[in-house]
Amino acid sequence: MERTLVCLILIFLGTVAHKSSPQRPDHLLIRLRHLMDIVEQLKIYENDLDPELLTAPQDVKGQCEHEAFACFQKAKLKPSNTGNNKTFINDLLAQLRRRLPAKRTGNKQRHMAKCPSCDLYEKKTPKEFLERLKWLLQKMIHQHLS
C-alpha cells in the first residue's frame, strides 16, 4: 500500500513539474515580430530608399505565405545613393533577408500548395512594398498563433 502511494505521489509530482516548466521559445514568432520592427524602421527611412519598382505580393493564399515572403526577400530593395543612412539601411535589409526558422508542423501541406511565381505579382513603389510586407507579416503572425 505504501509503495503504491509513493508511486502515485511521484507520478503526480512529475506531471506537475513537467507542466510548470517553461516552454521553448517560439523562434518563428520571435523572428516574425522582429521583422515587423525592421519594416517599421525601414518605413521611417523610405525617402532614403531607391525609388525602383519592386515585386510586392498581395492577396496571398493561406499556404503560400512563406513563398510570398521569399519574393519580398528577393526584391532589390536598396538605399538610394544620396541617402545619409546607407549603412544603417543596408544593415536593416540584411536582417530582412535572413532565412525564417523552420515551422514545426504543416511543412508537407505547404509544399503541396501551388503558389504563384514572384514574377506574376505587381511591381510597386518602396512605400507600398513595405506596406504589403507588413500586411503579410501580420497575416503570418495571426495564422501562426491560431
UniProtKB/Swiss-Prot annotation:
A GO BP annotation: positive regulation of natural killer cell differentiation
Q: Which UniProt keywords apply?
A: Cytokine, Disulfide bond, Glycoprotein, Secreted, Signal
Annotated signal sequence is 1-17
Family, per entry: Belongs to the IL-15/IL-21 family.
The glycosylation sites annotated in the UniProt record are N85
Query: Which Cys-Cys disulphide bridges does the record give?
Result: C64-C115, C71-C118
- State what this protein does: Cytokine with immunoregulatory activity. May promote the transition between innate and adaptive immunity. Induces the production of IgG(1) and IgG(3) in B-cells. Implicated in the generation and maintenance of T follicular helper (Tfh) cells and the formation of germinal-centers. Together with IL6, control the early generation of Tfh cells and are critical for an effective antibody response to acute viral infection. May play a role in proliferation and maturation of natural killer (NK) cells in synergy with IL15.
- The source organism is Rattus norvegicus (Rat)
| InterPro entries for this protein | 4_helix_cytokine-like_core (IPR009079), IL-15/IL-21_fam (IPR003443)
Q: What is this protein called?
A: Interleukin-21
Q: Which GO terms describe its cellular component?
A: extracellular space
